[in-house]
């Protein structure tokens, strides 16, 4: 499994609905870039200038909302993931 470093997290994207509320099926080109995901791995935290490590505010398993164009997309063992910095996370769901 991938292990993120520092204040980074690895997320699995939660795909958006393929149909509108009225039942119209959306083609891939019409779907918005996903902004929701589930954290599958989290780094050990950010290191301050003093050398002190600050733990992340999110945990593995959290569902999150993140900035629309944030992160780096990676493919690992046939699955697509997104690597984000903690500062790109806007909210935890639930």
From Swiss-Prot:
It holds the Pfam family Cpn10. One of its GO terms (biological process) is chaperone cofactor-dependent protein refolding. Its main location: cytoplasm. Transmembrane segments: none annotated. The keyword Chaperone applies. PROSITE patterns: CHAPERONINS_CPN10. The keyword Cytoplasm applies. GO terms for cellular component: cytoplasm. SUPFAM superfamilies: GroES-like. Together with the chaperonin GroEL, plays an essential role in assisting protein folding. The GroEL-GroES system forms a nano-cage that allows encapsulation of the non-native substrate proteins and provides a physical environment optimized to promote and accelerate protein folding. GroES binds to the apical surface of the GroEL ring, thereby capping the opening of the GroEL channel. PANTHER family: 10 KDA HEAT SHOCK PROTEIN, CO-CHAPERONIN GROES. Heptamer of 7 subunits arranged in a ring. Interacts with the chaperonin GroEL. Belongs to the GroES chaperonin family. This is Co-chaperonin GroES. It comes from Bacillus pumilus (strain SAFR-032). The lineage of its organism: Bacteria, Bacillati, Bacillota, Bacilli, Bacillales. The gene is groES.
């Amino acid at each position: 499994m991938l292990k993120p470093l520092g204040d980074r997290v690895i997320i699995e994207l939660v795909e958006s609905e393929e149909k509108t509320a009225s039942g119209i099926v959306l083609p891939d080109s019409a779907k918005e870039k996903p902004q929701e995901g589930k954290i599958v791995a989290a780094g050990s935290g950010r290191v301050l200038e003093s050398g002190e490590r600050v733990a992340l505010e999110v945990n593995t398993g959290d569902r999150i909302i993140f900035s629309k164009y944030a992160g780096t997309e990676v493919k690992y063992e046939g699955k697509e993931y997104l690597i984000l910095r903690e500062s790109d996370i806007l909210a935890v769901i639930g």
